[in-house]
A protein has these predicted regions:
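Signature of the first transmembrane helix
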Residues: 2-66, 93-98, 102-111, 123-126, ...
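Short runs within selected transmembrane alpha-helices of multi-pass transporters and secretion channels
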Residues: 23, 27-31, 47-54, 58-69, ...
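Interfacial segments at transmembrane-helix termini and the short loops linking adjacent helices
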Residues: 106-127, 354, 367-409, 418, ...
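Membrane-interface helix-capping segments at transmembrane helix termini in multi-pass transporters
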Residues: 6-7, 38-46, 72-88, 95-132, ...
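Transmembrane helical elements of multi-pass membrane transporters/channels
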Residues: 12-27, 183-202, 214-330, 359-362, ...
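Helix-loop junctions and terminal segments of transmembrane helices
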Residues: 27-31, 59-77, 146, 305, ...
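Membrane-proximal transmembrane or re-entrant/amphipathic helices at the cytosolic face
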Residues: 58, 205-253, 293, 476-494, ...
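Hydrophobic alpha-helical transmembrane segments
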Residues: 121-125, 154-250, 258, 262-266, ...
Length: 566
């Protein structure tokens, strides 16, 4: 198999960053439209309560199965037929989970105003239905991930976001009183788009791949076929499907049992961990929903600020985390000590872990420093004067920038740990996750009573600090047998930290001088200081940038050369 995992991971990260930027820009525009024209209470119902239902169902239904399937496929622990059967379990799992979740969302959580009651009920059922039907696309989505169809994922994800947004905005413009109805309809439509898009691709791809294989036996020069078919059909000798029907359960020939016991054991381990991780990820929304600490209007304010504060996480950190996790699962074996694995792969994984951690930590510090001076102007431009009145949004965004630094470090270190843990280690960590989850919920409730919405952010910082500590200990213990801890090379350099500190002081002086005079000049100072900070980081890490670009070009050239030789 000639596919390159590291190159695919890099491509996936770059394409995903572009997609996340497009997605977040659209979402931010829609949120700003709702805040200015419909009201924050409706935004609180849709973005907090209904999206929490979607997040709960999707995460608990597929996260454990998807992660275990990726690891099992790399280690050749099960057949493709067993993987497909396992992936289709997500449909009945999602349906089963939807029943109690709907009852809780409709009867147990704090009630919405009577004027929105019917729309809210429809929205809950629409979210549940969209999640269930979306699970039917897990099989082709997984195949695309394994065989590195990076552009397919980005195109389909971008397309369904545009379709969902277009339908939602069109309905709201026609009648802004049915915004929640529009939200539910748009969610169902986007789920259908995901299903149709993924299956349609393989409906056309598989027949062309079969013709490509037939012609490949008759020609000596693969360049002729590349000009005719393109590169997406090369190095696909291990693609197991000859019909789109084989992506359905029980259709692909299977000499063994329907399900793999080792895979199911790994699924159970990830499932226990997934429940706890979901509580940690969406804990503040669960607290807001279960206990009426904040009104829907205040929930919307927190959600808007939280999303804005998570720009770096959504644009950069999450795509890098996903690609890094995929790379580590394909490079490092879970059940074999590092000393017994191929040392070139271990060294490469060590370098990737160190460089990626250093990069995201530097980005997090950049966001923290500049948020102290630019939280107010950014929120004013986004939501208007009424939105920032009272100072709560600005205060939340400044505190949230602290969480970004911890989020950056936690995402990579924890991702590496999850990618290389054995089933036993995952089970052990689940006990710690249980402790972290309970502590996080208790801290969220208590700190919110003391500090208001800021308490959610402080509780999240404490939680991530606990998780970072555990991950750092794991990485150090694992690499002790093969060399130095790669995380020791992940701290930003003194030049970058010094320039960043000076720029932070200059921006605070700019804020004090230009406050109420000229936002434009204040923003210009920020742009110049950001450029200086990025330039100092690039200069200090110039060897890293050269190595990364050289390695990327070399691997890309090796793939092209090997393809030409075939």
């Amino acid at each position: 198999m000639g596919r390159n995992v590291l190159l695919s991971s890099l491509q996936n990260a770059s394409f995903s960053i572009v997609f996340q930027i497009i997605c977040r820009c659209i979402t931010f525009a829609i949120n700003a439209f709702i805040v200015r024209n419909v009201g924050r209470e409706v935004l609180g119902i849709t973005n907090v309560r209904l999206l929490l239902l979607e997040s709960t169902l999707l995460f608990l239904s597929k996260e454990a199965i998807q992660r275990s399937a990726l690891s099992s496929r790399h280690n050749k622990q099960c057949t493709w037929a067993q993987l497909i059967n396992q992936l289709w379990i997500t449909v009945p799992v999602c349906f089963t989970l939807a029943i109690p979740c709907l009852y809780i969302w409709l009867h147990w959580l704090s009630a919405v105003d009577a004027v929105y009651a019917e729309q809210y009920r429809f929205g809950c059922f629409a979210i549940a239905f969209s999640c269930i039907i979306e699970m039917t696309a897990e099989s082709p989505i997984f195949v695309g991930q394994v065989f590195c169809f990076v552009k397919l994922k980005v195109i389909l994800d971008t397309g369904h976001i545009f379709i969902r947004s277009f339908i939602f905005i069109t309905i709201v413009l026609l009648n802004k009183d049915i915004t929640i109805y529009a939200f539910g309809i748009a969610q169902i439509t986007s789920a259908c788009t995901i299903i149709v898009g993924n299956y349609a691709f393989y409906y056309f791809y598989i027949p062309r791949l079969l013709r490509y294989r037939d012609e490949l036996k008759k020609v000596d020069d693969k360049r002729v076929l590349r000009e005719k078919y393109g590169q997406q059909y090369e190095n696909m000798e291990d693609f197991p499907f000859v019909s789109i029907r084989q992506m359905l359960p029980g259709v692909l020939p299977n000499p063994g049992s329907m399900f793999n016991s080792d895979l199911q054991t790994l699924v159970l381990s990830f499932a226990k961990q997934g429940i706890l991780k979901q509580v940690l990820t969406e804990g503040e929304k669960y607290v807001m929903s279960v206990s009426p600490v904040l009104t829907f209007s205040e929930q919307a304010t927190y959600d808007v600020v939280n999303n804005m504060g998570s720009l770096a996480a959504r644009f950069i950190f999450r795509p890098i985390e996903d690609s890094s996790y995929f790379y580590f699962t394909q490079s490092i074996s879970r059940d074999t000590p590092l000393a017994e694995q191929r040392q070139s792969a271990v060294q490469e994984a060590s370098d990737v872990l160190a460089y990626v951690t250093k990069t995201v930590t530097s980005i997090g510090l950049l966001a923290f420093v500049f948020a102290q001076s630019y939280a107010g102007p950014v929120l004013l431009l986004y939501g208007g004067a009424d939105f920032v009145e009272g100072g709560l949004p600005e205060l939340l965004l400044r505190w949230h920038s602290l969480a970004i630094v911890l989020l950056a470090l936690n995402g990579i270190t924890e991702g590496y740990m999850f990618a290389t843990n054995t089933s036993r280690q995952i089970d052990t960590y689940n006990y710690y996750m249980a402790f972290f989850s309970v502590t996080f919920l208790l801290l969220s409730y208590q700190l919110t009573n003391w500090f208001g919405p800021v308490g959610f952010i402080l509780a999240n910082c404490c939680n991530m600090s606990f998780r970072i500590g555990y991950s750092v200990f794991y990485v150090g213990k694992q690499f002790r047998q093969v060399g130095p801890n790669p995380l020791l090379r992940s701290l930003p350099g003194p030049l970058y930290l010094s320039v960043l500190g000076v720029c932070g002081v200059l921006c605070k002086l700019s804020e004090a001088y230009f406050a109420g005079r000229s936002i434009l000049w204040h923003l210009l100072v920020g742009v110049l200081c950001t450029a200086a900070s990025v330039a100092s980081w690039s200069f200090e890490n110039r060897q890293l940038l050269r190595t990364g670009m050289a390695r990327y070009r070399a691997r890309k050239q090796s793939i092209t050369t090997s393809a030409d030789e075939r």
